Amino acid sequence: MLVEDHRNISCGGDPFNYLKSVMKAVSIQLDQGQDAKILLLKEKFPYTRGTFEGLARTTGLVLQEVSEKENEVIVNVRKQKN
């Protein structure tokens, strides 16, 4: 499983576009059927499950789970099989 840790990033731009880039990069790195875990901070990425699901879908990923632990968000995705 690929783990992408973006908890301590300093993003001066739009966090939504940053997250979109992260999802696209994860999609490129994974083979079909592989999983990834993306670690984020809730204060920097205050999005709902629906937002994460939409971003995953547009980048060829399937959202498996979104969980919160204290101020962290853990997003689990899988690369779609064609």
Protein language model features and the residues they cover:
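An N-terminal amphipathic alpha-helical segment
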Residues: 1-34
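Residues that cap or initiate secondary-structure elements
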Residues: 10, 44-46, 81-82
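C-terminal edge-of-domain segments
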Residues: 57-82
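Amphipathic, hydrophobic secondary-structure cores in small proteins
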Residues: 25, 29-60
